[in-house]
A protein has these predicted regions:
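Short S/T/G/P-rich N-terminal loop/turn motif that feeds into the first structured element of a domain
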Residues: 1-68, 72-84
């Protein structure tokens, strides 16, 4: 399933890239083609293809991710994408 995640947070793009790079390594068995587009400081779009939703959700709801989200007041809006 192709997804798009719009993340709004208090912090810098570098802050986001640190957690993204941590997650991307963990997600290597459950998602492919993960890419980030920067809208502005504090807002990014992440797109990718989730191949194992259960494993993906496990990583995205991990304690490390929850702590980062709380620290940076991160709100994620997730969309599924379908090629037309």
């Amino acid at each position: 399933m192709n997804i798009c995640v719009v993340s709004t947070f208090d912090g810098t793009t570098d802050d986001f890239m640190q957690i993204f790079n941590w997650a991307r390594e963990k997600l290597s068995t459950s998602a492919t083609d993960m890419e980030v587009g920067v809208i502005r400081e504090g807002k990014v779009i992440t797109m990718g293809n989730v191949t194992d939703m259960e494993k993906f959700q496990e990583i995205m709801t991990s304690e490390k991710m929850k702590e980062w989200d709380a620290k940076h007041n991160c709100v994620d809006v997730v969309y599924s994408l379908e090629k037309q």
